[in-house]
């Protein structure tokens, strides 16, 4: 059986890893969708799809399950979102998500969907990690070591700090 789990992974953290480990115990193969693949260089989405593919691939490489990491660009039409996802990924039998809308969309499309309890959601949340990076607080203990390596390789902390100096959309203020 092949499962599917989507996330923005901005960055991939230990909560994601915990969820992936739980799913891996239930499936033979796992498709990990990199959501919002077209977004990068903003405070909400500082990392590119390619950088997130590196993070996720390295973080799950030792799991005993065949894993496919697939970037998926946003589609602002919920009624056809599941078919968009299916067109971008290997076929899967079951979708996993903790997002009620995502679960509902898969169920309406006839795909079995399962949730999982959040793992340490109080600190294992992307916005919290990005804030810690911006303010120089410890974030490394909350992500797999391989993710720390990728973020250091791309100078990701400096990037997000620079982005945070601009406006809320991650774009430079206009001169007007």
Curated annotation (Swiss-Prot):
Family: Belongs to the archaeal NMN adenylyltransferase family.
PANTHER family listed in its UniProt record: BIFUNCTIONAL NMN ADENYLYLTRANSFERASE_NUDIX HYDROLASE (PTHR21342:SF0), PHOSPHOPANTETHEINE ADENYLYLTRANSFERASE (PTHR21342)
Catalytic activity, reaction form: beta-nicotinamide D-ribonucleotide + ATP + H(+) = diphosphate + NAD(+)
Pfam families: CTP_transf_like (PF01467)
The organism of origin for this protein: Halorubrum lacusprofundi (strain ATCC 49239 / DSM 5036 / JCM 8891 / ACAM 34)
Metabolic or biological pathway: Cofactor biosynthesis; NAD(+) biosynthesis; NAD(+) from nicotinamide D-ribonucleotide: step 1/1
Gene3D superfamilies: HUPs
Keyword Transmembrane helix: no
Assigned keywords, A-Z: ATP-binding, Cytoplasm, NAD, Nucleotide-binding, Nucleotidyltransferase, Pyridine nucleotide biosynthesis, Transferase
Record GO terms (molecular function): ATP binding; nicotinamide-nucleotide adenylyltransferase activity
EC number(s) per entry: 2.7.7.1
SUPFAM superfamilies xref list: Nucleotidylyl transferase
GO CC entries: cytoplasm
Source taxon at top rank: Archaea
Subcellular location: Cytoplasm
Biological processes annotated in GO: NAD biosynthetic process
Protein name (database record): Nicotinamide-nucleotide adenylyltransferase
NCBIfam families with a match to the protein in the record: arch_NMN_Atrans, cyt_tran_rel, PRK01153.1
